[in-house]
Amino acid sequence: MNNSEGLKSFQQSLADLPQWVSERLLQQINQLTNYEPVIGIMGKTGVGKSSLCNALFAGDISPVSDVAACTREPLRFRLQVGDRYITLMDLPGVGESGARDTEYAALYREQLPRLDLVLWLIKADDRALTVDEHFYHQVIGEVYRHKVLFVISQSDKAEPTSGGGQLSTAQKQNISRKICLLHELFQPVHPVCAVSVRLQWGLKVMAERMIKCLPREATSPVVSQLHPSFRTTVVREQARSDFGETVGAVLDSISAFPLIPAPVRAVIQAVRTTVVSVARAVWDFFF
């Protein structure tokens, strides 16, 4: 199905709806397709934030702010593929400076409501996690813990290091122990990931988990920014499903308008399944 056929199929699925309902739905879809996700990347100095972003995403990264690290305003980078954008926010890691951690707590409380996801990077050989644990439970807390995906970075530096072209069995065992430790300390909502950018290890699994962690409106825009090798069937189907569910949610919200006539509500409910199904089928047209 080419793009024009996809759009035609979707418009045909709306034929039984009143024009104002169709127009509102198309307006909401337009907002969705132009949605610009914001992903925070958190971690201590040298944890590998830049290398992970460059490995995951295909777009050109350009800074949109140039603020000194001593201020409460985090660095932002805008990533572009075609006409689509996402914003990456470089968030400082905690535990490196006691004087700064209080300031960082205020920064996080300010920024967390604006973020779709936080990738919290922890080096495979980092054992100083007491401050991280306290910060997670006290600052992130119950309200925002669903937005955090923990990522063990630089897994090739896990003991015993070899510098070879692949992880040893002993390293994989130690990484598994590290994953269990992080689950014990943080009790995260989402499974902990482990990656090595240098070895290109674990990135595909991480990309799939990242997409599952995002809110529905953010999955498709983020998928469009991923490096092609990470746009797996799992990733694409998750985005396709989320897009359909979002379209369905828009129809539900219109149907719930208090003054909407009962016959119009009945029509919306009658065509909902078909419209959602077609939206999933023509996802490639929109993204």
Swiss-Prot record:
Could you tell me the keywords of this UniProt record? GTP-binding, Nucleotide-binding
Q: Which GO terms describe its cellular component?
A: cytoplasm; cytosol
Name the InterPro entries on file: GTP-bd, P-loop_NTPase
Give a GO molecular function annotation for the protein. Answer: GTP binding
Q: Where is the G domain?
A: 48-138
Locate the residues binding GTP.
43-50, 90-93, 156-159
One Pfam family named in its UniProt record: MMR_HSR1
Give me any GO biological process, just one.
Answer: tRNA methylation
Record-stated family: To E.coli YfjP and YeeP.
> What is the designated name of this protein?
Uncharacterized protein YkfA
Specify the species: Escherichia coli (strain K12)
Corresponding gene? ykfA
